[in-house]
């Protein structure tokens, strides 16, 4: 009786946080929110919204429940880990074909959320540490990317990849910041020691 109630409550909270976190398959709101919101709002959303939900989920799992509980382990290994891997692969593939930079960065964020959830689903100290480090890195870096994109939009009135042609000459510092941000988000993933 009580155990089933606790498990149902846990599942409801995980689903609620998964919706706020934009965990696949509860991610539908994120690409549209990033694409159609003003860039300043998108910058704030990208830096904080999903990170707060992930942090709440982490605190909930490690403070309210014991991660040694068998049903918590089963839920995370059997449900969260496959969803994280699907998010990492599917969102990355979808992002490749996006010409709208806001949508591209939104799907990139979904893939990065997959990395964070994979670390959490390992239910280990190293997995948790890597999720937290990546959460902070992603928050700062994605905010910087959207700030750079906002500067590009002021100059070109456009958010498509083709509109970036020639901006390296007319906006060298912003273009440099954008390239560094992309490097920090995507190139450093496999080389980070915590993964």
Residue map of PLM features:
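Hydrophobic transmembrane alpha-helices and their helix-loop junctions in integral membrane proteins
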Residues: 1-188
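A short, hydrophobic C-terminal helix/tail in secreted or cell-surface proteins
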Residues: 187-195
């Amino acid at each position: 009786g009580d155990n089933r109630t606790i498990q149902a409550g846990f599942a409801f909270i995980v689903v609620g946080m998964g919706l706020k976190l934009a965990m696949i398959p509860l991610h539908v709101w994120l690409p549209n929110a990033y694409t159609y919101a003003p860039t300043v709002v998108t910058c704030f959303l990208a830096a904080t919204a999903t990170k707060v939900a992930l942090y709440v989920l982490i605190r909930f799992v490690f403070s309210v429940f014991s991660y040694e509980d068998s049903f918590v382990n089963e839920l995370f290994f059997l449900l969260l880990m496959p969803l994280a891997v699907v998010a990492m692969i599917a969102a990355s593939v979808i992002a490749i074909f996006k010409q709208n930079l806001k949508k591209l960065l939104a799907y990139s964020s979904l893939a990065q959320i997959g990395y964070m959830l994979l670390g959490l689903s390992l239910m280990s100290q190293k997995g948790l540490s890597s999720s937290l480090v990546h959460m902070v890195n992603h928050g700062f870096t994605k905010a910087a990317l959207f700030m750079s994109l906002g500067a590009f939009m002021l100059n070109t009135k456009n958010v498509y990849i083709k509109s970036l042609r020639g901006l390296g000459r007319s906006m060298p510092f912003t273009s440099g910041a954008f390239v560094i941000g992309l490097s920090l988000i995507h190139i450093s993933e496999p080389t980070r020691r915590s993964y």
